[in-house]
Design a protein with these regions (language model features):
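S-adenosylmethionine
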Residues: 1-231
Length: 231
C-alpha cells in the first residue's frame, strides 16, 4: 500500500497519469540484476543485457547469491539496473576527460556504502586510465564502512582506498579531486518495491531533513573539488 502522503505529493508533482505509472511499478516485483566484474571474466551468470551498462545483466530469477562461490570471489556485484546509470554517466564523462599530467586522475565517492557505485566507477577508471587513477571510497557510518571495505576487497582493484570520514574532513584537500560523486542521503522512494517499511516511514518532514543534510554535505565537501571539476 502506497503511503497516502507520498501519493498526494507525487500526484501534485508529476500529475495523476504519470503518478499512476509510478504507483504500478512500486507494486510490481523488483527484477534481480547484477553487474559483472570485467577483470574476473568468464564466471558471471548469464542474463538479459542492461542497455546502459555493458557489464549489467538482468537475471530471469533471483538466485541464492550467498550459495554461489563466484559471488564470494567478486565475479559480480548485485545491483539494481537503475543504479548502474550512474556508471553510464561517469563513462560518458571519462570519454572527454583529459589525462592529468604528472599525477593520477582523482575521484571521490563520498557516500559510498555498500559499494555499488565504487566498483562501477573503478571498472571505468581502470579501462580509461589503466593504473593512473585513485578512487577514494568514503562512508561516514562506521558499520556501513565495514561492508564497503569488504565489497571493495572482493572487487579487487588496488587503486581504491576506503575511508570513513565526515565530509568536512575533505576540505583539508582543497582542489584535490577531479570528480566527486555524492549519493547523498535521500527519502528512499527507490526502496518502496523492496521494503514496505520504507513506504510507511516516508514523510514530508523526512524529505526536509534529507534536504538539509544534502546541503550540508555538499557545502562541506565542495572545497576539495578542483576548479572546473565535476560534482
Amino acid at each position: 500500500m502506497i503511503n497516502g502522503s507520498f501519493r498526494k505529493y507525487l500526484e501534485e508533482a508529476i500529475g495523476s497519469d504519470n503518478a499512476l505509472v509510478a504507483f504500478s511499478a512500486f507494486e510490481s516485483p523488483a527484477p534481480s540484476s547484477i553487474r559483472c566484474n570485467p577483470f574476473k571474466s568468464g564466471i558471471c551468470p548469464e542474463g538479459r543485457p542492461v542497455t546502459w551498462n555493458a557489464y549489467g545483466r538482468i537475471l530471469p530469477e533471483r538466485p541464492v547469491f550467498t550459495l554461489d562461490p563466484h559471488f564470494h570471489a567478486g565475479a559480480y556485484y548485485v545491483q539494481d539496473s537503475s543504479s548502474m546509470f550512474v556508471g553510464h554517466a561517469f563513462r560518458r564523462l571519462l570519454e572527454s576527460a583529459g589525462k592529468p599530467v604528472g599525477r593520477p586522475f582523482r575521484v571521490l565517492d563520498l557516500c559510498a556504502a555498500p559499494g555499488g557505485k565504487t566498483t562501477d566507477l573503478a571498472a571505468s577508471l581502470r579501462e580509461v586510465f589503466g593504473d593512473g587513477f585513485i578512487l577514494v571510497s568514503n562512508e561516514v557510518m562506521k558499520a556501513r564502512a565495514g561492508v564497503l571495505a569488504d565489497n571493495v576487497a572482493l572487487w579487487g582493484d588496488p587503486n581504491v582506498v576506503v575511508t570513513s570520514d565526515d565530509p568536512r574532513a575533505f576540505a583539508a584537500l582543497p582542489g584535490f579531486f577531479d570528480v566527486i560523486v555524492a549519493d547523498v542521503p535521500c527519502s528512499g522512494e527507490g526502496m518502496f518495491r523492496k521494503d514496505e517499511e520504507a513506504q510507511r516511514q516516508w514523510s514530508e518532514d523526512n524529505v526536509a531533513l534529507c534536504e538539509a543534510r544534502q546541503r550540508r554535505i555538499t557545502a562541506d565537501v565542495w572545497p576539495s573539488l578542483r576548479q572546473d571539476g565535476l560534482f
